[in-house]
């Protein structure tokens, strides 16, 4: 049997990013052959990714990439916030965003296929299930800027705009904070407006107000509703005395569109009852 030295293990670990014990076992199995050991680890890392695939990945980070006039915002998930902070995981998320901006894939499945080998490698290294949850690409003749909030990178926005980059970035910060649904009233679905109008009308009737006053109340509430959900109508967080539309106009800037994500939106996180697990283990 070939002697497995500490240097051999260290070299294999440097090449694969996997744990020392995993590298040593692979070298033993390969009888000291470095290339064969590396192949064994690649195969096993793929198997490991398969074993972890069923586990809920509800933590993660956002990443963006801007390649000329093409920008991408992606959400990449993992299982724990500990791994979400790992430099290797963050690097993988940035690679996913870069790939999305360069290749402009048509679906999450297509993007996932493009980064599958890198995904398996980082899963093997960190031991958690990971997945590309969602992404969007903006391909435009206009300008693009992105803003990711905080060190944890869990909320962010990609903004398509005309005008000042600094102004657009500030509006991006506003979007993350105020969470508008769209840019302008023209983008609000008519069915949504009618649904709100019906609710407000019923409330006005129930209050016993005269019909003319009730009608004015309804229209006032509709205006308020539209101002709250549209970017242009919202009070600007950095100066609530003016709307975002007013701030943009006075700075010769126009927001054309935006994509806003928050990590984990809509994912049901598994709640682990550790006491129950310990009790069950004690019975075995």
UniProtKB/Swiss-Prot annotation:
Coiled coil: none
SUPFAM superfamilies, per database record: Elongation factor Ts (EF-Ts), dimerisation domain (SSF54713), UBA-like (SSF46934)
GO CC field: cytoplasm
Organism of derivation: Neisseria gonorrhoeae (strain ATCC 700825 / FA 1090)
Residue segments, region Involved in Mg(2+) ion dislocation from EF-Tu: 80-83
Pfam family, any one: EF_TS
Protein name listed in UniProt: Elongation factor Ts
InterPro entries xref list: EF-Ts_dimer_sf, Transl_elong_EFTs/EF1B, Transl_elong_EFTs/EF1B_dimer, Transl_elong_Ts_CS, UBA-like_sf
């Amino acid at each position: 049997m070939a002697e497995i030295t500490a240097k051999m293990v260290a070299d294999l670990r440097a090449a694969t990013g996997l744990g020392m014990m995993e590298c040593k076992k692979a070298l033993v199995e390969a009888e000291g052959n470095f290339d064969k050991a590396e192949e064994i680890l690649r195969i096993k890392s793929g198997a490991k990714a398969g074993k972890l695939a069923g586990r809920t990945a509800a933590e993660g980070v956002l990443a963006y990439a801007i390649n000329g006039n093409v920008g991408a915002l992606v959400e990449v998930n993992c299982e724990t916030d500990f791994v979400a902070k790992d430099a290797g995981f963050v690097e993988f998320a940035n690679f996913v965003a870069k790939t999305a901006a360069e290749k402009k894939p048509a679906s999450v499945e297509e993007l996932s296929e493009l980064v599958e080998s890198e995904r398996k490698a980082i899963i093997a290294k960190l031991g958690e299930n990971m997945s590309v949850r969602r992404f969007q690409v903006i391909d435009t003749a206009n300008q693009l800027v992105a803003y990711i909030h905080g060190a944890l990178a869990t909320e962010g926005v990609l903004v398509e705009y005309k005008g000042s980059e600094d102004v657009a970035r500030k509006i991006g910060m506003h979007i993350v904070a105020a969470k508008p649904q769209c840019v302008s009233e023209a983008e609000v679905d008519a069915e949504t407006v009618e649904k709100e109008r019906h609710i407000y009308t019923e409330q006005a009737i129930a209050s016993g107000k005269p019909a003319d006053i009730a009608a004015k109340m309804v229209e006032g509430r509709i205006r308020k509703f539209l101002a709250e959900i549209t970017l242009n109508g919202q009070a600007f967080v950095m100066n609530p005395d003016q709307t975002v539309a007013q701030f943009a106009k006075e700075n010769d800037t126009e927001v054309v569109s935006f994509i806003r994500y928050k990590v984990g939106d809509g994912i049901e996180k598994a709640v682990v009852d550790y006491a129950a697990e310990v009790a069950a283990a004690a019975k075995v």
